[in-house]
Amino acid sequence: MTIFNAVDKFTMMSGDRVKIKDLLSSRLTECGWRDEVRLLCRSILQEKGAISSFTVEQLVTEVTPRARSLVPDAVKKELLIKIRTIFDENEDDDIDPEDA
């Protein structure tokens, strides 16, 4: 099991997954990331607009790596700290991320 999968299952079982998603969503909105990605999508659609067979899946495939690279380091760091805090707070609980 990968670390990502272990963290995902642990946060889902502990009920903290929604809190992390809400924090990420609000931070991405605050820093303007959502607007940047929206503009990126528009730009790609205008560029590929002549191609009638351009699908949503193709748009997602093209936008995803660029959108991920646009996430500010401060947001990534804050989320990492939040996840570590959740693990530390639940360290003595019965939920073991390796068993998740």
Curated annotation (Swiss-Prot):
A cellular component annotation (GO) from this entry: DUBm complex
The keyword Transferase appears for this protein: no
Top-level taxon: Eukaryota
The keyword Nucleus is assigned to this record: yes
Disulfide bonds: none
Keywords: Activator, Chromatin regulator, Cytoplasm, mRNA transport, Nucleus, Protein transport, Transcription, Transcription regulation, Translocation, Transport
GO biological process: heterochromatin boundary formation; mRNA export from nucleus; poly(A)+ mRNA export from nucleus; positive regulation of transcription by RNA polymerase II; protein transport; transcription elongation by RNA polymerase II
Job description of the protein: Involved in mRNA export coupled transcription activation by association with both the AMEX and the SAGA complexes. The SAGA complex is a multiprotein complex that activates transcription by remodeling chromatin and mediating histone acetylation and deubiquitination. Within the SAGA complex, participates in a subcomplex that specifically deubiquitinates histone H2B. The SAGA complex is recruited to specific gene promoters by activators, where it is required for transcription. Required for nuclear receptor-mediated transactivation.
Subunit structure: Component of the nuclear pore complex (NPC)-associated AMEX complex (anchoring and mRNA export complex), composed of at least e(y)2 and xmas-2. Component of the SAGA transcription coactivator-HAT complexes, at least composed of Ada2b, e(y)2, Pcaf/Gcn5, Taf10 and Nipped-A/Trrap. Within the SAGA complex, e(y)2, Sgf11, and not/nonstop form an additional subcomplex of SAGA called the DUB module (deubiquitination module). Component of the THO complex, composed of at least e(y)2, HPR1, THO2, THOC5, THOC6 and THOC7. Interacts with e(y)1. Interacts with su(Hw) (via zinc fingers).
Annotated protein name in UniProt: Enhancer of yellow 2 transcription factor
Organism of provenance: Drosophila persimilis (Fruit fly)
Lineage start: Eukaryota, Metazoa, Ecdysozoa, Arthropoda, Hexapoda
